[in-house]
Amino acid sequence: TRLVSDWSSDVCSSDLIPARLTGLLIAAASFNPSVFTVMMRDARHHRSPNAGWPEASMAGGLGVRLSGPRRYGSHVSHEPWLNGAASDPQAVDIVTGLTLYRRAMVLAAILLVIIALELKA
């Protein structure tokens, strides 16, 4: 019941639109159309219906796999991979990820300016 409760609170939360918008911004900032494919295919497999969108988009943008099975103490969490056919991330992917994140934020700022100018007109 807790799983259903947590999932339904994620779906009904105010993060629904921002999560998807963030995924779209990351995909657009990657300048790679296949990132949209990865996001659309893999986001729904994440345990969080909201976190999966930007995470799947970043996995596609970096060309690496993210999430997947992991260990918390003695407990193994069997999470699915996002962009599972790709290789594991390397240290250099942190810098690349930050660059992709910055590009996505520039796109977000441009969108906000356009919206503000339209509302002002």
What name fits each language-model region?
Residues 9-121:
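Catalytic cores of Mg2+-dependent Asp-rich isoprenoid enzymes
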